[in-house]
Design a protein with these regions (language model features):
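Charged, terminal alpha-helix-loop-beta segments
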Residues: 1-149
């Protein structure tokens, strides 16, 4: 992982930890048990209040069309292989940033009722807050990249 990406992930980790004591950091570049290839989730947290894992997948640069499919596959692996039986389904956060936009997508709906999804949102940073943070970090990322080029 390049140093700039690592710095962005470090700042995102700090952002989530600053959201309160419910966010417990589990790991960065957390390895996922996939047969035949190496795979990692960028940041993994445990949310104590929601009793679930929060998996953050960061993509800087041009968004690839299969990102959502890979993200969903990773969430299924985490639910099957990493989460404990007493924990709720994993929440996924897909963060994509390029020169034109920042995209923040929560993956909550896989096995939750609409009422549960609404309840979860009050414990998580808003999409707008995450977009603003991602925009700030991406601008910093672009500035550093341009200086290094």
């Amino acid at each position: 992982m390049n140093e700039i990406r690592w710095r962005v992930l470090h700042q995102l980790r700090n952002f989530f930890i600053a959201q309160g004591a419910n966010f417990c950091f589990v790991g960065a570049e957390f390895p996922l048990p996939l047969v035949g290839r190496d795979a990692t989730i960028d940041l993994l947290f445990m949310h104590r209040g929601l009793n679930c894992l929060l998996a953050i997948d960061l993509h800087l640069g041009t968004r690839q069309p299969d990102i959502q499919k890979s993200h969903d596959e990773y969430l299924a692996i985490i639910d099957r292989e990493v989460k404990k039986t007493h924990e709720n389904p994993t929440i996924g956060v897909l963060l994509c940033a390029d020169k034109s936009e920042e995209i923040v997508e929560y993956s909550l709906e896989r096995s939750l009722s609409p009422a549960q999804v609404a309840g979860y949102h009050k414990y998580l940073p808003t999409q707008k807050a995450l977009q603003e943070k991602l925009h700030e970090l991406y601008l910093r990322y672009i500035a550093v990249t341009e200086v290094l080029d």
